[in-house]
């Protein structure tokens, strides 16, 4: 199971231990790059960065729902590398390839 955008959900921000329980059961999180750069508000950004520091980001999302919005996945990987190291970014890349080869 992939949990999309938990950083944008009040429920998970207020109850991060429940997200931890789902992850322990095998769920993955999908964090929006826009949240990592603050486009989804300070609360989403702070929680996304908290998840990153805890190693709880499994995949990244671009929110590119149409052809007019360009994906910024490379920016997301750059943030992950800067804050958590290249091995964390490589782990996310590898996981994403198992979903979309």
Task: Label each region the model flagged.
Residues 1-54:
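Domain-core and long-helix interface of multi-subunit machines
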Residues 4, 32, 61-62, 89-91:
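Residue-level detector of family-conserved "landmark" positions at structurally sensitive sites
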Residues 7, 35, 63-65, 93-94:
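Residue-level "edge-of-site" marker
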Residues 37-41, 67-73, 100:
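Short active-site-adjacent structural elements
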Residues 56-72:
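Short acidic/histidine-rich active-site segments
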Residues 74-101:
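Mid-to-C-terminal alpha-helical segments outside catalytic/metal-binding sites
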């Amino acid at each position: 199971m992939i949990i999309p955008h938990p950083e944008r959900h009040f429920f998970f921000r207020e109850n991060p231990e429940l997200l931890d329980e789902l992850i322990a059961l095998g769920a993955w999180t999908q964090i929006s790059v826009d949240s990592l750069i603050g486009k989804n508000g300070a609360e989403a950004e702070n929680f996304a960065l908290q998840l990153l520091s805890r190693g709880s980001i499994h995949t990244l999302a671009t929110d590119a729902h149409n052809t007019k919005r360009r994906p910024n996945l490379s920016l997301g990987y750059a943030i992950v590398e800067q804050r958590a190291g290249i091995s964390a970014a490589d782990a996310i890349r590898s996981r994403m390839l198992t979903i979309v080869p």
